[in-house]
């Protein structure tokens, strides 16, 4: 059994850094006139409730995504990343933190093809319900 559960750490400073880099990479690939495939070897649940028991137990998102969310202005380079956050938190309140597959899907747009893998068996059903996703 795997002991790591990302729901305790979603939206922390390392997650934010990883997802900013991901959004910049996807933006760069989209500039090319060639197709590309998104492969995620640790896709996780896809979306995390920041007010969940797990997230509140560690509170790591308070020093990560919450600090960015509360900023009045951000560098233009973060526009793709922040637009994804706004998409999943359309009420204006920070409630959800999207994982890598949802960030990539939102930035890539249609048509997209995702190949997602996850070792936690209980997270695989959330992976399979994503349209155009191949899950293993």
Where are these regions (language model features)?
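Gly/serine-rich nucleotide phosphate-binding loop at the start of the catalytic core
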Residues: 32-40
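Acidic active-site catalytic centers that drive phospho-/nucleotidyl reactions
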Residues: 18, 40, 118
């Amino acid at each position: 059994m795997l002991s790591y559960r990302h729901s305790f750490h979603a939206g922390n400073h390392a997650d934010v850094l990883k997802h900013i880099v991901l959004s910049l990479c996807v933006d760069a690939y989209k500039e090319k006139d060639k197709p590309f495939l998104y492969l995620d070897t640790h896709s996780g649940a896809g979306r995390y409730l920041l007010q969940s028991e797990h997230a509140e137990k560690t509170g790591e998102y308070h020093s990560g995504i919450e600090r960015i969310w509360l900023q009045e202005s951000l560098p233009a380079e973060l526009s793709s990343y922040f637009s994804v956050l706004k998409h999943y938190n359309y009420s204006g309140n920070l409630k959800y933190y999207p994982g890598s597959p949802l960030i990539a899907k939102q930035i890539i747009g249609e048509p997209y093809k995702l190949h997602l893998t996850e070792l936690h068996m209980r997270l695989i059903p959330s992976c399979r319900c994503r349209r155009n996703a191949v899950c293993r």
